[in-house]
Curated annotation (Swiss-Prot):
GO terms for biological process: 'de novo' pyridoxal 5'-phosphate biosynthetic process; pyridoxine biosynthetic process. The lineage of its organism: Bacteria, Pseudomonadati, Pseudomonadota, Gammaproteobacteria, Enterobacterales. Pathway: Cofactor biosynthesis; pyridoxine 5'-phosphate biosynthesis; pyridoxine 5'-phosphate from D-erythrose 4-phosphate: step 2/5. It holds the Pfam family DUF3410. The active site is at R208, E237, H254 (proton donor). PANTHER family: FORMATE DEHYDROGENASE 1. Transmembrane segments: none annotated. Keywords: Cytoplasm, NAD, Oxidoreductase, Pyridoxine biosynthesis. This is Erythronate-4-phosphate dehydrogenase. SUPFAM superfamilies: Formate/glycerate dehydrogenase catalytic domain-like, NAD(P)-binding Rossmann-fold domains. GO terms for cellular component: cytosol. NAD(+) binds at D146, T175, D232, G257. It is an enzyme of class 1 (oxidoreductase). It comes from Pectobacterium carotovorum subsp. carotovorum (strain PC1).
Amino acid sequence: MKILVDENMPYARELFSRLGDVQAVPGRPLPRDLLAGADALMVRSVTKVNADLLSGSAVKFVGSATAGTDHVDDTWLNANGIAFSAAPGCNAIAVVEYVFSSLLMLAERDGFQLRDKTVGIVGVGNVGRRLDARLKAWGVKTLLCDPPRADRGDAGDFLPLETLVRDADILTLHTPLYLDGPYRTHHLVDASVLDAFADGRILINACRGPVVDNAALLEALQRGKKLSVILDVWEPEPELSTDLLARVDIGTAHIAGYTLEGKARGTTQVFEAWSEFIGTPQQVALSSLLPEPEYAEVTLTVPLDEALLKRLVHLVYDVRRDDALLRHVAHQEGEFDRLRKHYQERREWSSLHVICADADSADCLNALGFTASVRGAR
């Protein structure tokens, strides 16, 4: 069997070669002639999978090593007998840690304590619920908005978006992109929402670019709207607005989910789905793939506070690096995708073992996603 894999899917060649002949291919653009004779196609979010790409091909399985699936026309795939599997939740921890790192950076810069803020989370799926749990572990008040879950009667105190816009100091978006329908999220944050969002607040988009009307956001900032803005996703990509980038506080190249662990989870999830599809199910232990991190262990001699948490977080990942990289090259054609293709290895907080002086600090760090223990009790 011939299996095409995105050249930027870590461990893909290593894993899929167990089950067939593997060819690494570019994700954007993906030339149609490379599909000749292929039985399966493994992609990331940069590849639009639809009739234009696959009609007339022999592909019978598509795997997307991503949490989101708006780049895949799964209706067309189903109608044409092509199986599809994605990797829901694979990069959720990475996105949560991106948001947390960004907020701690703003807190240090602007002189506030994150625990004193109220965070409104829009979209309480794989990312949103994990972010909610970690913020609460740090003592941060959260407000949740998720109309589909509210209408289904899911457990949770869900509020209208208008309430979050009114009451939250920080609004962070973690929804799928729905272009229409009762739960439309395209331009969910538009000019009217921006007008209602008070000055001095923080807006974060790390889900899909068009969830925020980028033109309306740029216009609001140009008119003097006093918002701190964190954007990892843009409208459109990869041709983002450099004028908007110049006005946001943190801007990155759609890399919030790009931890080594998150990428590896995505690859292993679609590999396991493919192995089941062909009748040879296999399970992969993530730990068997990952290398030793650059920083594996650190010892604390004092109790944990927000300044110390920020230092631990930024020891593993400092979002300012990615912000600086995008600003340096954003005006150059093709550099947005190049940054993503050649992204520097980034680990999750769990890769760092923190030896604490007290049990309360260790308990808190474990709840936040680190690997922590008390000195002498390891």
